[in-house]
């Protein structure tokens, strides 16, 4: 396993910064200004290869490319009908299949995506170390309780929709040699009633297990967001390690978002990697134990007025992670 970075900025300056920090593998989050995506959403193979060559000039390999299925509120997504079962679902699937084939032709090893209808929810910020602030979620402080225009979206309806999609895209991914890495639901929603009538089928470890069984393939796995998994747990310190062990042994962890929280299920704040409830040294020890060989990427970081673009925060997270990897290698 090794450090990686998620890049939404592909400028020379940003790539130089990443290379100087020892980053040799990245997930590309943006298609903007790359020429990869046409106006109709379909992808072109030559610009993907051109981007791979450009990254290589900085000593960087593209391990993962963003498939473009966002975690935003469904009405703001490019494919609002995909997980909701709307009339545009089949057209969206056809386009995604075409893009998976393009990724395979360009030898992109992995595509990441989200299964989220209601978006990433937070309720504010809390004071943190040295004047930084932490993103916070407390379900008791969430004020919008009305149903979305979708009406009630119980878990089984969402499962039916998800399996419909997976049955059509996962076999294609397997044929093309492209792994599909889904992000768990951030945050977990109340398990009994959901929120605004919407349930989160990837908001529990059991839901994640069901996902990989639904269309069982070595090409269907996770962008394993360790922070999001911690948000599902009542005891993140122990439960996160158990989840790493389970999905790692199943070889369904395709990349890792490495971030830490304080708190847990329905009430948490996103903190620095070294001051949360999950022991990162122990977490990395378990990744090594199960044979994980992919990227460990910083994800959400605290905000600092002294670091408006979060570059120093990411630098700290990368260096901290690299130090832990090196320490483990000598143990």
Task: Enumerate the predicted regions with their spans.
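Histidine-acidic metal/acid-base catalytic patches
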Residues: 1-4, 9, 14-22, 53-57, ...
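Structural motif corresponding to the early beta-alpha repeats
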Residues: 32-163, 174-175
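Basic, amphipathic N-terminal segments that precede the first structured/catalytic domain
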Residues: 18-35
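Short, well-structured secondary-structure segments
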Residues: 25-30, 63-64, 181
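Short beta-strand and adjacent tight-turn residues that come in two discontinuous sequence segments
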Residues: 28, 113, 297
């Amino acid at each position: 396993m090794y450090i990686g970075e998620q890049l939404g900025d592909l400028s020379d300056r940003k790539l130089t910064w990443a290379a100087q920090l020892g980053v040799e593998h990245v997930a590309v989050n943006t298609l903007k200004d790359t020429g990869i995506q046409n106006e109709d959403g379909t992808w072109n193979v030559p610009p993907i290869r051109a981007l791979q060559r450009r990254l290589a000039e900085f000593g960087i390999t593209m391990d993962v490319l963003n498939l473009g299925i966002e975690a935003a509120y469904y009405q703001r997504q490019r494919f609002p009908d995909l997980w909701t079962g709307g009339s545009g679902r089949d057209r969206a699937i056809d386009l995604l299949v075409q893009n998976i084939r393009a990724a395979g032709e360009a030898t992109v090893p992995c595509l990441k995506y989200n299964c989220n209808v209601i978006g990433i929810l937070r309720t504010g910020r809390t004071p943190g170390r040295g004047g930084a602030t932490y993103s916070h979620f407390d379900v008791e402080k969430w004020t919008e309780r009305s149903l979305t225009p979708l009406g009630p979206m119980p878990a089984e309806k969402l499962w039916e929709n998800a399996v419909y999609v997976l049955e059509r895209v996962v076999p294609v991914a397997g044929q093309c040699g492209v792994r599909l890495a889904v992000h768990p639901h951030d945050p977990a929603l109340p398990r009994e009633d959901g929120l605004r009538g919407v349930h989160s089928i990837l908001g529990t470890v059991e839901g994640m297990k069901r996902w990989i069984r639904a269309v069982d393939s070595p090409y269907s796995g996770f962008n394993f967001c360790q922070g999001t998994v911690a948000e599902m747990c009542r005891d993140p310190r122990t439960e996160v390690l158990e989840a790493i062990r389970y999905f790692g042994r199943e070889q369904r962890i395709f990349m890792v978002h490495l971030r830490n929280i304080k708190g847990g299920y329905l009430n948490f704040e996103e903190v620095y990697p070294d001051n949360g409830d999950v022991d990162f040294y122990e977490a990395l020890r378990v990744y090594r134990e199960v044979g994980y060989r992919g990227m460990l990427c910083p994800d959400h970081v605290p905000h600092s007025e002294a670091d408006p673009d979060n570059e120093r925060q990411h630098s700290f997270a990368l260096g901290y992670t690299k130090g832990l990897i090196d320490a483990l290698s000598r143990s």
